[in-house]
Regions:
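Assembly/oligomerization interface modules of large self-assembling protein complexes
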Residues: 23-104, 154-174
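Solvent-exposed, polar/charged alpha-helical surfaces in well-ordered, non-transmembrane soluble domains
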Residues: 124, 128, 132, 238-242, ...
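Sec-exported extracytoplasmic/periplasmic mature domains
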Residues: 131, 135-139, 143, 245, ...
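Disulfide-bonded cysteine-rich modules in secreted/extracellular proteins
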Residues: 190-210
Length: 450
């Protein structure tokens, strides 16, 4: 007589296996720990307190007793982790065929991963692969995450949310937004010159009223923004701007546009940064017309000017705040900047300064400060941000960059089961994540804005 319910539990999928083959590679690998500080066990919102160092406390004693002086400056921000998830499935037949087909002779059932008892090949082979893919996603989103990210076609936002990046806010987005808002002072940002003169894309659309005009519509980056006709062409365009400006400028982060009303009945559209591109069109319903003027084509940054990385890193060190001198600082920069620096050194027939050990690896230095080259930045600037601002550098301390997650202690972070009907071993991973930097005084940037 067969059982109504049946369950198998082999191979034993233990928390130890999860920790050894998944959590440690994904959240504890040196590629993470060497860049940032990871804070775990944040399940929702946590307050990050910043206590300013007191000074000027000691005064001349001119009378009996004491007179208190000075105080602490306490500021804080909240960090709220956002839920993330990935799912992976694998059929045993394909797994064996690709990796260890010869082990079938030992008695394994090729369609049932559950029978892999000795050795625990599945956990030892597949979990690290999943962990590596998950970590690649984590690092990409850690830097380039943007809740307003949109899918891109030929460098132009499509109006469709890009869930490869929209889960939470990454460091690049923090830096760009806070430079624009002057939260990070302009003195802590260094402009980077390239061999190509860069330009923003620009266009002006001017409405001419028609006797039967009922509404206007301007499409920007595949999204239509409409406005009912008001008392005049000028009033209509002003109303359009008041209605849509905030929504339009909140889109797509560094790949977005700025809209203004430079003159009567006109709307000017400009890419947010040099090299950014956009699509647009305008029409009047029921009569009237639009005329386009002031057209400027976008020109992206080209190769770096000769010796530009050397000049940039030197300028970044000149911009270091007094507070930064108290910490171990590290440069992070794109591969394009690294190659430019190498060319400079070759031309001068000099070599890099002494290498230092960082997280068990020898890394080059610039004036004694370690350099971490991030070729992944080059890749994702091209893919996720249309290649605008391709040369970037960051100088900070790892203690200042914070990645918050609930992952390493969440007992429900990873699930696994074998679906007998589909003959698939499935894994589901979920964690919460968010990034923040603690102190604007501990950051110097280069190449992030115009």
């Amino acid at each position: 007589m067969s059982n109504i319910f049946s369950q198998t539990t082999s191979p034993a999928f233990k928390r130890q296996a999860v920790d050894e083959y998944f959590i440690q590679p994904m959240f504890m690998a040196e590629d993470i720990r060497g860049l940032i500080t990871v804070r775990t066990d944040i399940k929702g919102t946590e307050t990050l307190n910043r206590i300013g160092r007191p000074s000027m406390l000691t005064k001349p004693k001119v009378s009996p007793g004491f007179t208190p002086a000075g105080g602490f400056n306490l500021t804080y921000t909240d960090i709220t982790v956002k839920p993330m998830a990935l799912e992976f499935e694998q059929n045993a037949r394909a797994f064996w065929g690709a990796i260890v087909e010869q082990l079938l002779a030992s008695g394994y059932r090729e369609d049932d991963v559950e029978q892999m008892k000795s050795p625990d090949v599945w956990n030892k082979v597949m979990l690290p692969l999943i962990a590596q893919a998950g970590q690649d996603d984590l690092i990409r989103q850690m830097f380039f995450g943007n809740p307003h990210a949109e899918t891109m076609v030929a460098g132009v936002p499509t109006g469709t949310a890009d869930d490869n990046y929209s889960g939470y806010t990454g460091f690049m987005t923090h830096f760009h937004n806070d430079l624009i808002a002057a939260t990070i002072p302009a003195a802590q940002h260094v402009a980077i010159a390239s061999g190509t003169t860069q330009y923003k894309q620009e266009s002006i659309e001017t409405l001419t009223y028609g006797a039967t005009t009922t509404k206007i519509g301007i499409t920007i980056n595949n999204v239509l923004y409409e406005q009912a006709y008001a008392s005049s062409a000028a009033a209509t365009m002003t109303a359009w701007l008041n209605t849509h400006k905030a929504t339009i400028e909140a889109r797509a982060g560094i790949n977005g546009v700025i809209v203004t009303n430079p003159s009567s009945a006109a709307i000017k559209i400009v890419s947010r940064v040099k090299g950014g591109v956009f699509t647009h069109s305008a029409e009047a319903t029921g009569g009237g017309s639009f005329a386009e003027t002031g057209v400027v084509a976008a020109v992206k940054s080209g190769a770096l000017a000769d010796n530009e990385t050397d000049k940039t890193l030197e300028s970044m060190l000149d911009a270091v705040t007094p507070e930064m001198h108290e910490h171990d600082l590290t440069f992070m920069l794109t591969a394009t900047m690294w190659r430019n620096l190498i060319h400079t050194l070759k031309d001068r027939q000099t070599i890099l300064g002494d290498a230092v050990m960082k997280n068990g690896l020898k890394v080059p230095t610039y004036e004694g400060f370690p350099i971490i080259v991030r070729p992944d930045w080059d890749k994702w600037i091209s893919v996720a941000q249309g290649g605008v601002k391709p040369h970037r550098a960051l100088l900070t301390t790892s203690k200042n960059l914070l990645f918050a997650t609930d992952g390493t202690s969440d007992s429900e972070m990873i699930e696994t089961w074998y679906n007998q009907e589909a003959q698939m071993r499935r894994y589901r991973v979920q964690y919460k994540a968010q990034t923040a930097y603690l102190h604007k005084e501990l950051i110097v940037l280069a190449g992030f804005i115009d």
